C-alpha cells in the first residue's frame, strides 16, 4: 500500500468561512500503530448528485509561519501540580504524588507494570529518545518503560539490586545493578526498535538491551485504541523519585550528520534518519 495513512475512519464534515469543505478523521501512520491514532484534515468536493469525495490532487496547506505546539514533554517536576503532558493509567491519583526539590515522588502500587502505578506521556515521533533520573526507596521497584496496557509493555525497572529488562510483558531478563538505588535510565525507540541504557551520572551509559522489537504493542493485538506511551513506574513499597525527565526527537540534525552521510536516506512517508 502506497498510502501514508492506514485505517482511516470516523470522518466529520466541516466547512470554513470561505465556503470550503473538509473532512476531519483519524488514522494510523503507515507501519506505526504504536503511535496511536492521529487526527487529519483533508479537502472534499461535492458531486452533482449530492455526495462528496476527497480531492485527490489537493495541495497541502502551508502555514504562514512555522508554529510549534505549546506542549513540552520534558519536565523538571518543579510542581506544585503535575504537567498537562502526564496522565495516570486507569486511575486519577494526584494524592499519590509529592513534589520536593525538583523531584517527583510517586507512591508505589502493585508489584509489576501490569498492576503497578504508571504515569504516562504520549510520544510524538517515530525516532525518539527519553530519559529520567530515578531514586528507589526501600522495598520499591521503579523504572522507565514504554506502556500500551497491562499486557503490553517494555523497558527497564530496578529495585536497587537488579535491573529487570522487559522485552514484553511475558519476557523479562535480569542483570546485576552495580549502580544502586539512584540511577538514570534511557530509552531510544527508533522505528519500533528499542534500546535500553542506564547510567550513574547521566553522562556515561551502559547498554542493557538493544534492538528490541516493540512494533506489535498496539491496538490490533491488544485492543483499546491506545498508543505505546512513555511511562514512569513505581511498585512495591514506599515511593520512587523521578527528576530531570527528558524527551527529544532523535532524528540527527544537519550539524550531526557527518557520521551519517553514508547511510542517510529520505523516507517520504516517515523518516527515521
Predicted regions located by residue number:
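Entry beta-strands of beta-propeller and related beta-repeat scaffolds
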Residues: 19-23, 51-52
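Conserved blade-ending motifs and adjacent loop-strand segments that build the rim/top face
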Residues: 1-14, 211-221
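Short, solvent-exposed loop/turn segments at conserved positions within beta-propeller repeat blades
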Residues: 34-37
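Short strand->helix junction
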Residues: 3, 30-31
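Long, internal scaffold/assembly segments composed of regular secondary structure
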Residues: 17-18, 64
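Structural WD40 beta-propeller signal
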Residues: 14-16, 47
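Extracellular glycan-recognition regions
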Residues: 30, 42, 48-273
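Short loop/turn segments immediately following the C-termini of beta-strands
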Residues: 26-28
Amino acid at each position: 500500500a502506497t498510502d501514508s495513512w492506514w485505517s482511516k475512519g470516523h470522518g466529520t464534515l466541516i466547512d470554513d468561512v470561505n465556503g470550503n469543505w473538509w473532512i476531519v478523521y483519524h488514522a494510523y501512520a503507515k507501519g506505526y500503530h504504536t503511535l496511536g491514532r492521529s487526527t487529519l484534515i483533508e479537502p472534499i468536493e461535492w458531486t452533482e448528485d449530492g455526495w462528496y469525495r476527497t480531492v485527490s490532487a489537493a495541495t497541502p496547506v502551508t502555514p504562514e509561519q512555522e508554529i510549534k505546539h505549546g506542549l513540552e514533554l520534558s519536565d523538571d517536576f518543579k510542581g506544585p501540580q503535575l504537567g498537562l503532558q502526564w496522565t495516570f493509567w486507569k486511575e486519577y491519583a494526584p494524592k499519590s504524588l509529592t513534589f520536593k526539590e525538583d523531584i517527583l515522588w510517586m507512591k508505589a502500587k502493585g508489584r509489576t507494570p501490569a498492576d503497578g502505578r504508571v504515569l504516562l506521556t504520549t510520544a510524538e515521533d517515530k525516532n525518539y529518545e527519553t530519559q529520567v533520573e530515578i531514586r528507589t526507596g526501600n522495598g520499591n521497584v521503579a523504572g522507565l518503560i514504554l506502556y500500551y496496557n497491562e499486557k503490553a509493555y517494555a523497558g527497564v525497572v530496578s529495585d536497587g539490586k537488579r535491573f529487570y529488562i522487559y522485552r514484553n510483558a511475558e519476557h523479562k531478563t535480569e542483570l546485576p545493578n552495580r549502580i544502586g538505588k539512584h540511577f538514570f535510565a534511557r530509552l531510544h525507540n527508533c522505528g519500533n526498535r528499542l534500546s535500553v541504557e542506564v547510567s550513574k551520572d547521566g553522562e556515561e551509559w551502559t547498554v542493557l538491551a538493544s534492538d528490541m522489537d516493540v512494533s506489535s504493542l498496539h491496538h490490533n493485538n491488544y485492543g483499546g485504541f491506545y498508543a505505546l506511551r512513555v511511562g514512569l513506574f513505581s511498585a512495591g513499597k514506599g515511593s520512587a523519585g523521578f527528576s530531570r525527565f527528558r524527551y527529544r526527537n532523535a532524528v540527527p540534525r544537519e550539524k550531526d550528520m557527518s557520521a551519517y552521510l553514508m547511510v542517510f536516506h529520505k523516507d517520504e512517508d516517515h523518516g527515521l534518519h
